[in-house]
A protein has these predicted regions:
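Mature extracytoplasmic/lumenal regions of exported proteins
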Residues: 149-201
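Sparse, context-dependent recognition of short Cys/His-centered cofactor- or disulfide-binding micro-motifs
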Residues: 144, 201-203
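Negatively charged, low-complexity tracts enriched in Asp/Glu with abundant Ser/Thr
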Residues: 130-147
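Low-complexity, glycine/serine/proline-rich disordered segments
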Residues: 1-106, 110-131, 135, 167-168, ...
Length: 228
């Protein structure tokens, strides 16, 4: 074979094996809109009150790990001040948030119908596979749906990546992954408490501004799921 190319083999049914044609992946997460978040990191020095708030919020986050596990994990990562990205636990979101699973299912229905329509119009004689990736779509968790994810992420984006295989008899199967992304930042307004300890967005914003806690990116993808 020619140097620099990927060899292709064929199986018993003459389908190509090896590396196929590239398809687009999910697009880069667009990030925050202007005005979100706490502004520049470490824009001022930390004073004693900041350190006292940091200590109290760390105690509060540790105390809420059983009731609000993902909210506590995300807050502790913020207070850890590394600024590194953190996995978003997309599988947990799909399991806990019917609205998210509903949006992903809607993506699947839309593109499955398109694949079935195209396959029928193409008069195919064998199975054919269609890949697709959606745009990032904005979502919002309501406290009434799940308080853990309300405090863990609030607003976020999702995208769905899928392959749909249509067979000659009109049946089909699909494999998909849900992708989620968010910027863990504080916009003000939220406040929650565990026992005597209350944690507010405004306090957390000041910790980022003073350089002893840091906003970061949340990114995640689900396991590959199959259907229907």
């Amino acid at each position: 074979y020619n140097p620099g190319t990927v060899p292709q083999e064929t199986g018993p049914n003459a389908e190509a094996m090896g590396l196929g044609s590239p398809v687009p992946g999910e697009r880069e997460y667009p990030g925050d809109s202007e005005g979100e978040g706490s502004g520049p990191y470490a824009q001022r020095g930390a004073h004693r009150g900041d350190h006292m708030t940091h200590e109290a919020d760390t105690t509060g986050a540790a105390a809420m790990q059983l009731l609000l596990p993902d909210a506590a994990r995300n807050l502790l990562h913020f207070l850890g001040n590394s600024g590194r990205p953190l996995d978003m636990n997309t599988n947990g979101m799909l399991n806990d948030l019917p609205t998210l699973q509903g949006k992903v299912s809607e993506d699947l229905r839309t593109y499955t119908n398109e694949a079935l329509k195209d396959a029928k119009a193409s008069d195919y004689t064998g199975s054919v596979t269609y890949p697709f990736v959606t745009n990032w779509q904005p979502e919002k968790v309501e406290k009434s749906e799940n308080s853990n994810w309300f405090y863990a992420v609030g607003g976020y984006h999702h995208a769905t990546a899928d392959t749909i295989t249509v067979y000659p008899n009109g049946s089909y199967t699909y494999k998909y992954q849900a992708h989620t992304a968010d910027r863990y930042n504080r916009d003000g307004g939220k406040k929650f408490g565990i026992g005597p300890i209350a944690v507010s967005d405004n306090e957390l914003q000041e910790l980022h501004r003073s350089g002893i806690a840091q906003e970061y990116n949340l990114v995640g993808e689900s396991e590959v799921r199959t259907g229907p």
